[in-house]
Amino acid sequence: MNFSSFIFKVSDVFKSVIHEASDVVTKADLDNANAHTHSLAVGLGIGIVLFLIAGLIIGYFISMKIMKRQLKKNPPISKDTIRMIYQQVGRKPSESQINEIYNRAVKQK
């Protein structure tokens, strides 16, 4: 047995294996598998996008709730801050002026 006859035998074996494999897996099976894979990928893509949108919406409302709670506990302006601003400009405000400005600032939130 020489090398060329060995190559021919190996190629015949490969041909028979490929022929048997093609009998087992038909074109319809491949099309069905491709369609299933495609629909799975589309469904997964839509699911990811929907979960991202839902996460953004839920995150927005949670962050707004936390922000409002923080502003209520620690307002950005206090009566002492208003007093200090008036003193920096060289004025001595009355308590009613301070209360009026503070109440307007709190209502604007």
UniProtKB/Swiss-Prot annotation:
The answer to whether keyword Transmembrane applies is yes
What protein does this entry describe?
Answer: UPF0154 protein UPA3_0273
- Which Pfam families has this protein been placed in? UPF0154
Q: How does it sit in the membrane?
A: Single-pass membrane protein
Looking at the UniProt entry, the stretches that span the membrane are 42-62
Q: Which HAMAP family match?
A: UPF0154
InterPro entries assigned: UPF0154 (IPR005359)
Could you name the Gene Ontology cellular component terms for this entry?
Answer: plasma membrane
The entry's keywords: Cell membrane, Membrane, Transmembrane, Transmembrane helix
Task: State whether keyword RNA-binding applies.
Answer: no
- Where can this protein be found? Cell membrane
Top-level taxon: Bacteria
- Sequence similarity: Belongs to the UPF0154 family.
